[in-house]
């Protein structure tokens, strides 16, 4: 795989790379660069997580070594539970992520508290605090913070630590959903002041909640868990927001775009003959066009999405139900 092929794979379904020139140079200079993403072990693993894990799988196929940070201290700072509770969830996260298709030989799982309590790391937190305003630290947490009103000081420490994770894990590429962008830009601006390189960052889309909310979240109960049973998936999708002829912010269409067409070269929408019969698509764009034109009914999209998604998530259900 040449550099152009690797670049195309890395940027597939990404919202942005900061910067693409840096990414290209990285691919030209390193056969096995290191990419990382961090997750708070809290609540259910859902399609929002899978969207990012799928990108890490792309990165592995493009030659990257992948680090998955199970950010127990971050979850604690963000009021997601006690340290004991979030650490118990870390193994559940690991099993789900591997079952989604990560190559175990190219994946390194790191618990945040394994290195974030070290003296050098702590000193860097203090150094970074000297170069970061309170306003900027708070602003970087806009789409992440658990408490938006009267937040605790811990939510100011959080983005400083996330920026420092990049250098203390020796990462070449920092990956995250678009909600992480402000923290990554903070890292790019401030880390050079501490003598570190400005990190290259890649951002994935934010999938909408099933209720049409701007973000799928376990705390809002508007999600498909990756270990949901088929009948649960079907019931959730039947109730999901899917306005006829509207593509913008439509979670059902996003499921087709980011998950179903990723796994299938052809997607067949099965429906009764009196409503036009079965129709097969070879690209997401064709399906979206027909939906916007009124050729596809929301219920037909939902029913067929449930079948495809249940099959895609089958390995995860099997892994989670097996003894740990």
From Swiss-Prot:
Residues that coordinate or bind L-tyrosine: 36, 158, 162, 165, 180
Reaction catalysis annotation: tRNA(Tyr) + L-tyrosine + ATP = L-tyrosyl-tRNA(Tyr) + AMP + diphosphate + H(+)
Record localization: Cytoplasm
Chain ranges for the short sequence motif 'HIGH' region as given in the UniProt record: 41-49
Residue sites binding ATP per the record: 218
Keyword Acyltransferase applies: no
Pfam families, A to Z: tRNA-synt_1b (PF00579)
Keywords: Aminoacyl-tRNA synthetase, ATP-binding, Cytoplasm, Ligase, Nucleotide-binding, Protein biosynthesis
UniProt short sequence motif 'KMSKS' region, positions renumbered to this chain: 215-219
One biological process term in Gene Ontology: tyrosyl-tRNA aminoacylation
A molecular function (GO) term: tyrosine-tRNA ligase activity
E.C. no: 6.1.1.1
A single GO cellular-component term on record: cytoplasm
Top-level EC class: ligase
UniProt key word Ribosomal protein: no
Subunit (UniProt): Homodimer.
Family as reported in the entry's similarity comment: Belongs to the class-I aminoacyl-tRNA synthetase family. TyrS type 3 subfamily.
NCBIfam families the record matches: PRK08560.1 (NF006330), tyrS (TIGR00234)
Function: Catalyzes the attachment of tyrosine to tRNA(Tyr) in a two-step reaction: tyrosine is first activated by ATP to form Tyr-AMP and then transferred to the acceptor end of tRNA(Tyr).
Annotated protein name in UniProt: Tyrosine--tRNA ligase
Organism: Methanopyrus kandleri (strain AV19 / DSM 6324 / JCM 9639 / NBRC 100938)
Encoding gene (name): tyrS
């Amino acid at each position: 795989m040449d550099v152009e092929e690797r670049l195309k794979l890395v940027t597939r379904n990404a919202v942005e790379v900061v910067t693409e020139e840096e990414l290209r140079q990285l691919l030209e200079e390193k056969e096995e660069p290191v990419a990382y993403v961090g997750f708070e072990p809290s609540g259910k693993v859902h399609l929002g997580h899978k969207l990012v894990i799928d990108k890490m799988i792309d990165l592995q196929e493009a030659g990257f070594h992948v680090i998955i940070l199970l950010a127990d201290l971050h979850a604690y700072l963000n009021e997601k539970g006690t340290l004991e509770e979030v650490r118990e969830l870390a193994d559940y996260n690991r099993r789900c992520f591997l079952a989604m298709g990560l190559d175990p030989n190219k994946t390194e799982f790191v618990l945040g508290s394994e290195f974030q309590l070290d003296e050098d790391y702590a000193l860097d937190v203090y150094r970074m605090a000297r170069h970061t305003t309170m306003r900027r630290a708070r602003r970087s947490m806009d789409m992440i913070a658990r408490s938006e009103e009267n937040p605790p000081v811990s939510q100011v420490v959080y983005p400083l630590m996330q920026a420092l994770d990049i250098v203390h894990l020796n990462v070449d590429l920092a990956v995250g959903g678009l909600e992480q962008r402000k923290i990554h830009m903070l890292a790019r601006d401030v880390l050079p002041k501490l003598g570190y390189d400005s990190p290259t960052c890649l951002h994935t889309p934010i999938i909408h909640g099933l209720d049409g909310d701007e973000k799928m979240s376990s705390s809002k109960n508007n999600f498909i868990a990756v270990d949901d049973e088929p009948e649960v998936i079907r019931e959730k999708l039947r109730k999901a927001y899917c306005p006829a002829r509207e593509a913008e912010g439509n979670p059902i269409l996003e499921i087709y775009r980011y998950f179903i067409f990723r796994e299938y070269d052809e997607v067949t929408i099965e429906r009764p003959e009196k409503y036009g019969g079965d129709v097969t698509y070879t690209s997401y764009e064709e399906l979206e066009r027909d939906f916007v034109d009124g050729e596809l009914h929301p219920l037909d999209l939902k029913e067929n999405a449930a079948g495809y998604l249940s099959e895609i998530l089958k390995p995860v259900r099997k892994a989670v139900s097996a003894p740990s």
